[in-house]
Regions:
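Hydrophobic/aromatic-rich core segments of domains that either
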Residues: 72-88, 97-107, 112-113, 118-203, ...
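N-terminal accessory/pre-domain segments preceding catalytic cores
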Residues: 1-83, 109, 130, 183-215
Length: 215
């Protein structure tokens, strides 16, 4: 069922208000409106059940990283904030298996024993979004030299560059292994990719004559 048929106005208003506070925060104030809509505003990561996750995640993580906003090196750098938060997540993981998490929040620790890169990516997306750190989800559907897909996150820096990282594991710029032969990278988006659609339409039209001959 579509969200528009079940979601309540109060839920959307609450989500928007909290997202705007993060946009005004130290790690989000550099974002354009479109970037804000893609990274901090969304109330979902995928098709998971609706919940007031901003309220339930904040007590779990905000006290842990409040000190970041008081240090110049971290205060206005999404890159440094991302590094620090992901280090906290990494250290809170039992390293022997990298699958059991101390965090008890259901959105980021449910069925942890079955986690793969997708669950790590979704978990860190929730945490970063709740803290106001602008992060995307990127993926490759197929490696060039092995039979696997892979998902990872990318933090959007104030310079405009995106730096990839693996949630609960590596810091920015240490996520992609060039030896895996990444062929093509896609980015999860909440808005329609009009440029991509126009390229497809243009490519399809190029296979047909503009003025078909009629016999």
């Amino acid at each position: 069922m579509e969200d528009i048929k079940i979601i309540k106005a109060d839920y959307l208003i609450d989500n928007i208000d909290k997202a705007f506070l993060h946009w005004e925060g130290p790690w989000g104030k550099h974002l354009t409106f479109d970037e804000f809509c893609e990274t901090l505003l969304p109330y979902r990561v995928d098709i998971e059940p609706l919940s007031h996750w901003r309220d339930s995640l904040s007590p779990e993580f905000s006290p842990t990283i409040d000190w970041l906003s008081h240090i110049d090196e971290y205060a206005y750098s999404p890159y440094q904030a991302c590094q620090a938060v992901n280090d906290i997540l990494y250290k809170s993981t039992v390293y022997a298996n990298q699958i059991f998490h101390k965090f008890r929040h259901p959105l980021i620790a449910r069925n942890a024993k079955d986690w793969n890169c997708v669950q790590y990516v979704y978990g860190v997306q929730y945490v970063m979004r709740d803290l106001g750190v602008p992060v995307h989800i990127d993926y490759t559907p197929q490696y060039g030299v092995r039979g696997n897909r892979h998902y990872w996150n990318s933090v959007l820096h104030y310079t405009g560059h995106s730096y990839p990282f693996q949630g609960y594991n590596s810091g920015p710029e240490r996520s992609l292994d060039p030896h895996n032969g990444t062929i093509k990278v896609f980015r999860r988006s909440y808005a329609r990719n009009r440029r991509w659609i126009s390229e497809i339409v243009k490519d399809e039209q190029s296979h047909f004559p503009i003025e078909p001959l009629v016999e």
